[in-house]
Amino acid sequence: MGFKIVALSRSEDKKDLAMKLGAKYYFSIEKSDFVKEIKDLGGAKAVLLTGPSENIADKLIESLQEGGKLMLLGTNNKKMEFSINSIIFGKKNIQGWVCFDNEVKKECLEFSLKNEIKPMIQIYKFEDLQKGYDDMSSGLARFRSVIKF
């Protein structure tokens, strides 16, 4: 598709995994001027925000190139603030997306099968149910949490 994948996270602890999964660049949002770094690469055509934070939306919108799209894929039920002017004058878009539609789920599964994509999961024993829940709630779980009975 011709995209250069840029991964962003709060710290460096996810860098190795992000690079292994195909990211060409990795920036810590707390240790670097990631907006400048992304703009220096030409700006982002699309940003997939999986873990929304109250103070990140404006910076992500700023990192988009003209006509770019910020896709909101996760929620934490908190408000996000951003500049309306940067959206209007930059011809930028914000879109929410959830995979509740059965046709979309089918397309995703077919894409995964066709491209031999295997899910990455974090397995917890049944007796570790509380730890799994706590890890998931606190953001420590890296992948989809699965309880093994």
Q: Where do the language-model regions lie?
A:
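Adenosine-nucleotide cofactor-binding segment
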Residues: 1-59
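Residues in the short beta-alpha loop(s) of Rossmann-like NAD(P)-binding domains
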Residues: 11, 76, 100
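Well-formed, non-transmembrane alpha-helical positions, independent of function
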Residues: 17, 37, 59-62, 86, ...
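Residues at the C-termini of beta-strands that transition into short coil/loop
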Residues: 30, 74, 98
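Helix-to-beta-strand junctions that scaffold the AdoMet/dcAdoMet cofactor pocket
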Residues: 64-66
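Rossmann-fold dehydrogenase core element
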Residues: 69-71, 81-122
